[in-house]
Amino acid sequence: MDETPTTHFGYREVPEADKARLVGDVFSSVARRYDVMNDMMSFGSHRLWKLWFVATSGVRPGDRVLDLAGGTGDIAALLLPKVGREGSVVVGDINGDMLRVGRDRLLDRGLLQGLSWSRMDAEALPFADRSFDCVTMAFGLRNVTRKERALAEMHRVLKVGGRALVLEFSSLRVRALQPLYDLHSFHVLPRIGRLVAGDEESYRYLAESIRRHPDQATLAAMMEASGFDRVDVRNLSAGIVAIHRGYRT
């Protein structure tokens, strides 16, 4: 008898078919406090990381950009001035609650032109080959069940000469800081999650998912195996997060 394929959900092993639902439950729970969560996880640094991420994207006026796991709208809001009136940004997210929060937030800011929102699975993108000049994914890849499949899809929908960028928590490069980082991730963060959002378990999963995510070298190799060329890595904040960039040639 064939065994049911499994994957990780934080430190738990779960059936592959269940992970998307479990991750969806987490993000539906934290959707309206997602910025607060990111501030707690990064001491507010996520705002600077996102600015740097978009600054290194190479996006130009007239480009068509796909922002995956972009439901909060943070990256889209930064991309819109870069694509200009002739360009466009498609925000894709598998979680409808996240999309609603992000769409409402950007509507309140009057950001409408050149922006569209769509619920989609990063492992099966609903676009033709070579549709986008750039694909971005910030703090989303670690929650994908089959990361290699998502990377291959990102490569598929890129135009020749296009680039994909992944911003994600990664492996700390300064080992002396690891005990303090672990204390914050596994003890402080879940307790704050319980006090602020009444949801300790979701915040515990998010901390665990960071540790289970591939390190810098492993993710770079995965991108190369998915077809990307000229893959480079930039560590931010001593490797707490990293930007991976690859090109379709």
Q: In which residue ranges do the predicted regions lie?
A:
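Hydrophobic beta-strand segment of the Class I
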Residues: 34, 135-136
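A short acidic, Gly/Pro-enriched loop at the edge of an enzyme's catalytic core
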Residues: 123-134
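N-terminal auxiliary segments of SAM/dcSAM-dependent transferases
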Residues: 1-25
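C-terminal alpha-helical "lid/dimerization" subdomain adjacent to the S-adenosyl-L-methionine
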Residues: 18, 167-222, 226, 232
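Core SAM-dependent methyltransferase catalytic element
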Residues: 226-249
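A short glycine-rich, Lys/Arg-flanked "PGG" loop and its adjoining helix->strand segment in the class I
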Residues: 148-163
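Class I SAM-dependent methyltransferase SAM/SAH-binding core
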Residues: 64-124
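Conserved alpha-helix/loop element of class I SAM-dependent methyltransferases that forms part
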Residues: 29, 33-36, 40-63, 78
